[in-house]
Amino acid sequence: MDIDTHEIEDRIKGQFDHGHATLFWEDEPGEYAEIVDALDLGNSAIVDVTGAELSSKRTILRERPARSLVIYRSGPKPRPQDDFLYDVKLAATPFTCKMEGIWASECGVPMPLAAVLSEHGSFFNSKERRGALAATPLPKGDERALRLAMLAACAGSRAEAPRDAVRDVVKRLLVDLGRGQGKTLRTIRECGLAATLWPEVLEVVGYAAPAGEDPTPEDLALRMLKARCASLVHDGAPLKADASRILADLAANSRTRDSYDALAREYSDAVSSSVPTGERTMEAVGTNDAVPVFDDWIVADMLGRALDGALRAADARAELNLRLHTHWFEDYACQYEALAAGAAALEGIEAYKGTCTAMTTEKGIFEAYRADWYRVDGEYRRFVGAMRKAPAGFKRRAGELVSQVDDAYGKFLVDLTDRWQLHLMDAGTYPPADIPSQADFFYEKVEKEFPSAEDGKRLGVIVSDAMRYEVGADLAARIASGALSLGRARVGADCEAMACMLPSYTQLGMAALLPRGPMTVDLTTENVLKGGGATDGLANRQKVVEAAMPGAVLLQASKVLEDGLPPVEDAPLVMAYHNAIDKRGDSRDTEGEVFAACEDAISQVAKIAGELLRAGCGKVIVTADHGFLYQDREVEEFNYAAVDGLSDLAHAPGQDVSHGRRYAMGTTLPKSDILIEYSSAELSLNGAGRFAFPRGITRLRLRGSGARYVHGGASLQENVVPVVTIQRVDSRRAAERTGVQGFLTGRPSITGSTVTLDVYQTEPCSTKVTPLTVRVGLYDPDDASRLLCAEERTLELASTAQSSEERKTRVTLHVTDDVDDCAAAVLRISRRVGNTNQFDAEWEQRLSVNRAFGNDFDF
């Protein structure tokens, strides 16, 4: 006997407790015949019908000795046509004391299949597996279905459909393999299900081991990785699209990504060796991201083209956007950004050469810089920032490109600065009347807003030390693209330019931004008096501003970032002084971090602007005291201006002389051909001081200070500062995201293994049109979440190209066998909702499914 008397009693009572009123116990060997009468079933009854089926039938049906009844019969089963109790047997619940019968009863397996379970005894040693088999929604009505359900239980699958169950089993095998484990495969083998596993994998994935060899998870993983990049790898019979579907699921799931990454790296060489050398280009690889070496190929291809001068900036940026949502992008992001920014910087410099000669006035040069030339500075900043983060190997390979960009940018700065200095005094004084001036900022941008602007709401001003124009323009572009969120309110931003005072150093710039008044520079301390009052420090500036605007509040931005905004309900004006760029740039030890400081400044200023808007400011205006010059390479000897006698004068007693890297001031200055000298009056200042600036981008020698980051001189990078206006806007004025439309390349039917469409970006991106993230996939028309292709494709529509052809992206989706369950499928493009992770349908096309014919010819 498999079980003792007490266990039999407990099992029978358990069946009754589950609501089974009649149990039919078929005991063919008769091994329990002697103990049947001794069973204690309480208020239930047991009827032994052995040899007396017909007479017992009356007892069972008419007299029924108890509400809960066990019908016991020993000996061979009669044929159905000879069985007097066949109808009773069909109506009753089968009961058995054989282990396979017990397992069948416990796990919801039909009794006719109980014999199958005896082949897999180890499976039932686990309560967890028995529970999973009992709870599974998978069919268990035949031997194959039953074994597949057991296989799914071994892998912990909760799938409802057989194909999904096989996918789950394969995923579990690959996860184990990627983590150096083999638990699932060992369990499958111990349970006697290995013979079931590989035929099911063949059916769903299409994988079979080479002739004469046994299938293994290792071979399966390699074949699946090759299948995921079948457009590149032409190696043997292709697998089904489900292979790519399984890998895509592993890669996308944060809990299994580590396993996918481990497998992709382990088999990367084996996959890549199957790709012809001629197809290792950015065009051939496309969006394929099965293994990381594909990104290495693209980066190498782009770098080679950049060094040859054959990489268009638009192509580099398009490639970055194409790879933006691929699996390994984060590992290569800085390399893509460096190549795109480097190409854009070089291209922008070439464009400058073609237009600069046409600008022959101070205003013309200023306007050209404000409108276009400033982009070179931004691309150079992005290039240097990306190169700083790039891995050492890429830095070595890109050394020649770095030299090209540094050389070209240095020449650009020299030429542009020479032109600016040549026309600096065209109007006789600086700043000229036809260029917006920092000295007029408070009147034009603050006082004119009151008392009625924005229905009396307060105004916010953020002064970010050394935020040059290109950084402010970047800030405005990011906010316009949605970087600043105020709940459901839309926030817009635009950037204007104005000329700062000369010399372009902190004390003078900060004074110029205060209410109007004559300014005088103390030639010894470099502090500035305005209207006779001191302007250095927050307390002195508070006095000056409050005299013009009672109730105004001035703050240090660092306090706002740490503690939040204090109560400002009664303040008509809130001014916050921010210092991230100049703080790091002005130190010799940290000047190399200045571009990283620019990124910090953008995020910090945006955060402070949000605080001010939430506090009731109708507008927030961001500006700066001055800009800066920065070159990442060490300053060479010829870039220093040697001025005889300047250092001696600066240290001589009784001489009011001081100087920085880019300016000198005093009542008397040494005469030198390498200095441009102006009087206070020429620079719109009071006093008898003289001010001199090195020609071009040369620096004055100054002990103890850095030389790569400088300001104070006369260059557009130092002299043009932003005026960024940030405010809530209605939907008509807010920047809109570009649109998207799909174009199917063939007939609206699925007859093969792929579906191809062109994803069209309807408008080029600009300051008024922002990029859009879309997702492309094939779905069940009755279940929008059910995917019918190997994977969804995520695209970043960010092209600025005017040509509609350049704004098209071709997408090929590989159809899984799930599509054969449907009469139709829906091809859908969904757009990201704001900055969330949600997507809404934007474009759809219904496709009929007719693969019975097409598959015969789909190679």
Question: How would you name each of these model-derived features?
Answer:
Residues 1-459, 466-620, 624-859:
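…; additionally, a secondary subgroup of soluble metalloenzymes is captured
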